[in-house]
C-alpha cells in the first residue's frame, strides 16, 4: 500500500470512528430507539450521503457499536484472566468483568442486548456485522480456553461436558441476570429483592456449578 492509499485508509478509519462516537453520544442522550441517522450525521458534522457511505442503515450502525463494545469487553476479559492463576478464578473473573462492563458502558451493553436478539446473517452480513460476529467469536474462544485450562489445573470439574456449550451457557446466564437486574430493578424492589443481590447469587451459583470437588 502506497503513502496516499495509507492516508486515505487512515482518514476512512478516523471518520468511521467519529461516526461511532457521535452515535454513542446521541444514544446516551436520547436512547437507541429515538436515535436517527440524521441526528448522528449532525453530531458527526457529516452529510447524510457521506454517513450512508460508512453505514448503510441504523442496524448496520448498531453492529458497528456492538463490535466496539465487544472489543472493549475482550480486553477486560483478558485483563481479568491475567489477574488469576487458576481457571476457575479466571472464568469467575470474566463474569465479574462482564458485570462491570455493563455498568461502565451502558450504551454498549444496551446495543449488545439488542444484537443478541437478532438473527445472525451468515452470507449477506455487512462488514460491521461480520466484524461484530468475529469479536463475539473471539470472546467465545477465550472463554473456552479458560474453561479447558481450569479442567487441566483441577479447579474446574471435568464432567461438565463440551466447554463450548458451557461457555455459551455461562454467557447466557450472566447476560440474562445482568439485564434483569438492570431493566427490572424497580419491579424487583417492589418484591423486596435487590438487583445487586440477584447478580451476586448468580455468581455464587456459577461457582458452585463449576468448582471441582476436592
Regions inferred by a protein language model and the residue ranges of each:
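Basic, helix-initiating cap at the start of DNA-binding domains
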Residues: 1-30, 34-43, 60-63
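Hydrophobic alpha-helical connector segments
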Residues: 64, 78-108, 130, 163, ...
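Helical hydrophobic small-molecule/effector-binding pocket
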Residues: 92-121, 140-145, 171-178, 212
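Hydrophobic/aromatic-rich alpha-helical bundle segments in the mid-to-C-terminal region
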Residues: 109-110, 114, 129, 133, ...
Amino acid at each position: 500500500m502506497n503513502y496516499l492509499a495509507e492516508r486515505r485508509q487512515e482518514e476512512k478509519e478516523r471518520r468511521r470512528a467519529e461516526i461511532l462516537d457521535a452515535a454513542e453520544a446521541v444514544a446516551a442522550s436520547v436512547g437507541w430507539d429515538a436515535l436517527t441517522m440524521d441526528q448522528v450525521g449532525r453530531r458527526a458534522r457529516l452529510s447524510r450521503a457521506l454517513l450512508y457511505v460508512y453505514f448503510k442503515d441504523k442496524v448496520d450502525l448498531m453492529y458497528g457499536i456492538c463490535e466496539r463494545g465487544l472489543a472493549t469487553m475482550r480486553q477486560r476479559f483478558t485483563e481479568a484472566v491475567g489477574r488469576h492463576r487458576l481457571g476457575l478464578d479466571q472464568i469467575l473473573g470474566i463474569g465479574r468483568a462482564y458485570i462491570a462492563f455493563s455498568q461502565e458502558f451502558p450504551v454498549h451493553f444496551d446495543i449488545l442486548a439488542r444484537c443478541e436478539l437478532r438473527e445472525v446473517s451468515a452470507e449477506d452480513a455487512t462488514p460491521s456485522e461480520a466484524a461484530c460476529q468475529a469479536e463475539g467469536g473471539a470472546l467465545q474462544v477465550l472463554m473456552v480456553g479458560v474453561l479447558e485450562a481450569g479442567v487441566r489445573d483441577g479447579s474446574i470439574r471435568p464432567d461438565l461436558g463440551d466447554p463450548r456449550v458451557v461457555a455459551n451457557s455461562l454467557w447466557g446466564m450472566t447476560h440474562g441476570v445482568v439485564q434483569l437486574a438492570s431493566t427490572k430493578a424497580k419491579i424487583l424492589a417492589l418484591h423486596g429483592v435487590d438487583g445487586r443481590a440477584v447478580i451476586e447469587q448468580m455468581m455464587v451459583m456459577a461457582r458452585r456449578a463449576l468448582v471441582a470437588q476436592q
